[in-house]
Amino acid sequence: GLTTPTEKIQDTGRLQLPEEEHYPYGDFHPQCWIYRQYGGNHGWEDLADALRDSCNIYFYTMGHRLGIDKIDEYASLFGLGEYTGIELPEVKGYVAGPATSEALGVEWYGGNLLNAAIGQDNTQVTPLQLANYIVTLLNGGDHFVPHLLKSVKSSDYSETVYEQQPEVKNHIALDPANVEAVKRGMWEVANDPKSTVDQYLSNLAVEVGAKTGSAQVGSADKEADAVFTL
């Protein structure tokens, strides 16, 4: 594989590659949010650390290694930018990539890969797609079709008139060690004092994991929209 759950990536504030590796993005050195806001960095981070801290540099680095084709392949397998199949009107949205840019009539540049790696650029997904993606990841790779109705009972609850059977759309082969690292990172988001949101989630009646996100609105003078998955 291209990495392991325990590999640590150094966040110095701006994306840098090892000296012996060609840097293909010209003068574009995207920054981590902590550098933009506070002039700081996260130092050395593994996968769980990066999830807890939303370390852009870690995921820029992974995006660089994967390439946009592999990112788009897995995004589709997890149902991002695809119809979920729920019994409601829905939109597919987009996952950033050369084909999406062409369809939208905009230019695709190599550096767009880095923005796509953190869910930005032209990526637009629905809350249900996001939730179903997390479920698929954490259950070990079974991508289910979501449904509104679980079952129908008779008026006295003595009989089940209808019961929706689980419907697996596809299965993704996931390394259990990787899944456990993601679970640990999401647990730390909700419970580790180093997290920016643990104060809101660590004392709930039910122990939870979470992931924060920022849906940027394309304007520097407007606040980004916050998104949470629990």
How would you describe each model-predicted region?
Residues 2-230:
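Beta-lactam-recognizing serine transpeptidase/beta-lactamase-like catalytic domain environment
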